[in-house]
Amino acid sequence: MVPALSPSRAADFMQCPLLYRFRVVDRLPEPATPAMARGTLVHAVLERLFDLPAGGRTRDAAGELLPGQWTRMVDERPELSDLVDEADPARLQSWFDDALRLIERWFTLEDPTRLEPAERELYVETEIDGLILRGYVDRLDVAPDGRMRVVDYKTGRAPSHLFEGKALFQMKFYALVLWRLHGRVPTRLQLVYLGSGELLTYEPDEHDLRAVERKVKALWVAIERAATDGDFRPRPSRLCDWCGHKQLCPAFGGVAPPIPDDAVVLALDPRASGAVELVTAPPMAAGATDAEATADRRAPGSPRAGVVR
Ligand code: SF4
């Protein structure tokens, strides 16, 4: 099997090799959280809204899509019903109201009546020197002259300048894949933060994307080495507060499960290392951005990264 890497698993390993192990090797379950489910619901509504004619893409229309999309999600994953007491109309309404607040914030940032996305929830994949890179792009806008804008929705808050690079890694990863697929560097990468009502934009060039390519290749070498050595060390950081496996983490007094005999195979299994989710962000990342938003905003950001607040 050809090895594969998704931006989510790449980000896991960069954040903490033990987190990568818990997710890819041990495959520990991670119950859905309200933040994750709300993010998925909001994504679904923003995606479906573009099925409507341009003039009909209103706040009210988006609100009307919420119950149907929620029902579809629960049908597909019945365990989600544990997150919301649907027998209590007030709680159900409150759940939809929370999602609607995020959607309404989106309307302050973008005008869907003036957008015609070329693609929504676009699966992208390319192979670079024997490593498959894959992921889902929330939205791809293509201008008549071929310029591409890659858009990703985040239901958390925008990161501080200190963490913008981390937030943009995923977008540059997609830009690299699109560049390899179409022979053209996307003109703009745009992260839409619905939690704080901010846009983070970046205009990549070939130099950037070559650097991302080197980084991804080096990351895969590091993953292979960790798998061969069975050495997935914890890397504690403030993001540990959002780690669903903290109680098992030796850095916090826990005991990790014994590493499986076939850990090497599991760690490099492309179905896990290249796993992609149609979800806004794992719960840890969503919460992390909330925390990061309170970090030191005086830190210098990338010179071509722009935040519209
Ligand atoms: S708690 Fe922190 S150090 Fe431990 S596995 Fe999770 S992210 Fe890694």
List the predicted regions and their residue ranges.
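Solvent-exposed, amphipathic alpha-helical segments
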Residues: 41-52, 222-226
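A non-catalytic, helix-rich entry segment at domain boundaries
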Residues: 45-120, 298
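Active-site-adjacent bridging/hinge elements
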Residues: 14-22, 144-152, 217
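Metal-dependent nuclease catalytic regions and adjoining charged, substrate-binding loops involved
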Residues: 4, 145, 177-309
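Short, polar/flexible loop-turn hinges at active-site or ligand-entry regions and domain interfaces
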Residues: 26-35, 51-57, 160-161, 229-232
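Mg2+/Mn2+-dependent nuclease catalytic core
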Residues: 122-214
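Charged, glycine-rich intrinsically disordered N-terminal tails and low-complexity linkers that flank
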Residues: 1-48, 306-309
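Hydrophobic (often cysteine-bearing) scaffold residues that line and stabilize catalytic clefts
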Residues: 34, 38, 42, 95, ...
